[in-house]
Structure formats: C-alpha cells, structure tokens
C-alpha cells in the first residue's frame, strides 16, 4: 500500500477496514478496550454474540502485521456477566427476605395432607394467603429475572482471547487485573442475588515474537514496586462518563504505554472512544493513531488531543481537564 494512516491523527471508520492501512511493523503497542457485548448504545451494530466474537477475532488477526516484532497488543476487557442463554434452565431463586407472606412450602404441604381435596383457592383461604403464594410455594416459580425472560449466565473471556491470539500468531505474555470502583449504580441485583457487583476487569498482554526491550528505567523504583510488577492495578474509575458510556481512566493506558514503549514510539487504539489512549500518548511523548467507527467519538477524541497537545503534555492536563476544555477545532477525519 502506498499511503498509510498518518501518526497523531484520529480516523473515523470500522477498525477492520482501517487496520490494514497502517504501515506494517510500525506499532510498538496497541492498547484498547473493545465493546463488551453488554447492551451499550454503541454496540447495536453487533446483532449477536457470534457477531461480536467474529469482529474481535478479525481485529486481533489484523494486528499481527502492523505490530513490530517484540511489540504488544494490550486488551482491556471484562467477562460477560449476563450472557443470554435460551438453553439455560430457569434459575430457581426464592428471595426469602423479600417474602410478603410468612407461609412456607411446608405449611402448604401440611394443609394439602389435611385437606387432600382442596384446590389452590381453598388452600389459600385455609392458610390465609393468596392463591399465587400457594402456587409459588408448591412450584417454585418465583423466578429471578421474570418467569419468561431468557436466563443469563457468566461467559468467561480469557480462553476466547487466548484462542484469538494464538490463531493470529501472538502469545499471551501476561495478564493484569484492573480493580476499579464497585459498579453499584449499574447493578440491579446486588440486594437480591448471590451474584457479585462488577468491580474489576482484565488486561491481556499479547506479544508478537521478536526482540523486546526491557527498560526498568521507564518507571521509578517505587512505581515498579507499587504497580509495574504487580498483578492487580488499583485505579479509580472515571468521575463522570456522561459523554461516553464506557470510558476508562487515563491512568490505565498511561501505565501500559510507559511500561511497554519508549518516547517516540507509536501507540494505537482502534476503539479510541473519548481519546484516553491518545491523550496518554501525548503526555508521555509518544505518537498515536486512533480509530473509532462513530464520528461523535472521533470528534471528542480529536478535541481531547488538541487540548493535551496545547498543554504540551504537562501533568496538569489530565483526561478530565482535556475533555472539559476541548474547544479547539477538530483535526482531519479520514472517512473509511
């Protein structure tokens, strides 16, 4: 290809169409967070779990030619906590603490033994409860999630990511856990279920075979001790995500970029969203290429980059400030 995507630009289009336009072996590290298949507005183009999986497998595959030997792809992703499964039996979950009637299943069974000819209405009158209570105690049909709703289960993503990596030619070099704020406001079941609230995600480090530079001088001794060599990264979630449904904090890509790349290297984010990865690259004197399929996020990322560039990458230009002050004219957008 004669013309490649230019560095320090954000491009609008599907990653699967634009990744082949990046110069081969030019990316030191690609760090991104894909759609999680959890029903967000920007995921509507993915009609099924199979479509989501196929899209990401293709994105990983297309990374191999553009990552330089010894470079990395770092994927921030989470398990799918509510994957609809029509084959899953209904989960029988009677929430005892929320019962409106003290009548138990044993009470109903004793009443039936005393009055075997009674129907449910007569049993309800005898027990002083509703017919629905009798039915629930006998048949266990007080189903969490609705009587007719498709049941959901947890889908672990680690094995899927590893298969994508190996098929493309990468190896899973490392994994970290991002411990974030508990998602109380986004969780409907924390008061009436054994399921846990969402408070961590993963970072999978995919390595392309080749010589890798390990430079411990990129971090201070304290940083190596506190997070560089640690498997769990404790980073607060963003303070507000009103402009984007799934922003990750600036500190997350900044740690990856500082640890795995050198100043002047090129960093890629093919799901750039609000622009956090590009801002982190600017603040650490790296170059960047960003891609997003939605024009509104491309413009948002461009504005954040303009503010970060204007601030000359100083520590004061954190992500929130960049986004709040993003009043600069948009940079060039390349339509796919």
Protein language model regions, located:
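S-adenosyl-L-methionine
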Residues: 1-18, 302-336
């Amino acid at each position: 290809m004669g013309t490649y995507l230019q560095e320090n630009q954000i491009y609008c289009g599907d990653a699967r169409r634009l990744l082949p336009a990046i110069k081969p072996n030019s990316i030191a590290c690609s760090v991104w967070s894909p759609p999680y298949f959890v029903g967000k507005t920007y995921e509507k183009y993915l009609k099924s779990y199979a479509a989501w999986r196929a899209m990401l497998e293709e994105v990983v595959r297309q990374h191999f030619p553009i990552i330089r030997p010894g470079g990395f792809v770092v994927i921030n992703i989470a398990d799918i906590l509510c994957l609809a499964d029509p084959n899953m039996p209904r989960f029988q979950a009677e929430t005892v603490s929320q019962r409106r009637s003290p009548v138990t299943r044993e009470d109903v069974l004793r009443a039936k033994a005393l009055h075997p000819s009674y129907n449910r209405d007569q049993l309800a009158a005898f027990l002083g409860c509703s017919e629905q209570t009798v039915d629930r105690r006998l048949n266990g049909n007080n189903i969490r999630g609705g009587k007719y709703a498709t049941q959901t289960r947890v889908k672990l993503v680690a094995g899927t990511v590893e298969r994508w990596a190996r098929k493309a030619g990468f190896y899973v070099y490392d994994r970290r856990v991002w411990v974030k704020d508990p998602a109380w406001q986004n969780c409907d079941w924390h008061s009436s279920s054994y399921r846990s609230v969402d408070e961590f995600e993963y970072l999978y480090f995919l390595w392309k075979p080749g010589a890798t530079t390990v430079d411990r001088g990129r971090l201070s001794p304290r940083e190596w001790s506190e997070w560089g060599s640690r498997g769990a990264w404790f980073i607060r979630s963003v303070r507000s995500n009103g402009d984007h449904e799934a922003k990750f904090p600036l500190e997350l890509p900044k740690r990856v970029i500082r640890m795995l790349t050198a100043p002047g290297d090129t960093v890629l984010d093919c799901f750039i969203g609000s622009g956090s990865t590009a801002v982190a690259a600017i603040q650490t004197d790296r170059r960047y290429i960003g891609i997003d399929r939605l024009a509104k996020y491309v413009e948002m990322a461009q504005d954040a980059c303009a503010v970060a560039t204007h601030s000359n990458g100083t520590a004061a230009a954190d992500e929130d400030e960049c986004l709040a002050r993003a009043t600069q004219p948009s940079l060039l957008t390349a339509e796919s």
